[in-house]
Amino acid sequence: MSNEPTSSFYELRLPPSDGISSVNFCPNSVNLLVTSWDSTVRCYDTQNNVQKWQYNHKGPVMDGCFPEKNKVFSGDVFGSVKHYDPVAGVEKEVGSHEDGVRSVVYNSDTQQLFTGGWDQQLKLWDIRSDKMEISNHDLQSKIFTMDVSPISNMLVIGTADKYVTIYDTRQMETHLQKRESSIKYQTRCIRTFTDGKGYALASVEGRIAMEYFDPSPAVQSKKYAFKCHRLTESGVDVVYPVNCIAFNPHYGTFATGGCDKNVFFWDGANRKRLHALKTYPTSISSMSFNTDGNILAVASSYTFEEGEKDHPPDQIFIHNILSEKIIKPIK
């Protein structure tokens, strides 16, 4: 049996000074976008472990995305949506929501920016035009999480009322589907499958649901849910929220991070857990794989699931996956 390490990790220097809300790799790059409750949006060169640039909001930044080298988008707790071009060094206001912007996603295939807010609104923006806001959709409940598939062009939105709304981004006049979450507790995170055929949904109740877009009975029979991020403490089963999901773009397997301070790798097709990474100092707030799927960024940042209390500092760990066996699907 080989004793060679399966992964190595290091901590990014000079992390944000408050909670880390999101981490996202720029495609085909070692550059990592980090948004924070300290009102900053930062970019780190993960290979050289240095911060490259930073811009600020007037309040805590809840989400961001880095779809192309000259396109960065971010949204804050006051409803402001910003666009930053790192190549030109130019920052501009895209528009705003009436309440906090919880989720920011960009579809590179259709060149569309989507923002979802606590004001219950889904907004579609065209950053190429002077009048950037194209459409506005009232989802009648706070938006908690969104993701878009560049393969199928499906936009998936999870709301506070435990519904999931699905749009085809090429036909935004009305939603394609609206379905009740198969998990009865609050949705924390939604991420689309790498093949574009469905999505994984994480909940506060230590459970993941694997769902499919195709409404036919044959395809819907494949959906399932499983328990995770649970510990037995003093003979009691303790359930932790699952905060984030990150799909490996190369293998289609995925990682989950929870308030139990753990990150696990899963093979969804074979319904198996592949690997457990190290236990972190505190809750896992966000994760992102690079395009090649051999680097995973992990934000260890207390998510206040137990209210205000002393907690470890906010940190970002970069994992180099040295052995494909911990992330490759089971044959």
From Swiss-Prot:
One of its GO terms (molecular function) is ubiquitin binding. Belongs to the WD repeat BUB3 family. InterPro entries: WD40/YVTN_repeat-like_dom_sf (IPR015943), WD40_repeat_CS (IPR019775), WD40_repeat_dom_sf (IPR036322), WD40_rpt (IPR001680). Keywords: Cell cycle, Cell division, Mitosis, Nucleus, Repeat, WD repeat. One of its GO terms (cellular component) is kinetochore. The keyword Cell division applies. It comes from Dictyostelium discoideum. WD repeats lie at residues 15-54, 56-94, 96-135, 138-177, 237-276, 279-327. It is found in: Nucleus. Its main location: nucleus. This is Mitotic checkpoint protein bub3. The gene is bub3. PANTHER family: MRNA EXPORT FACTOR AND BUB3.
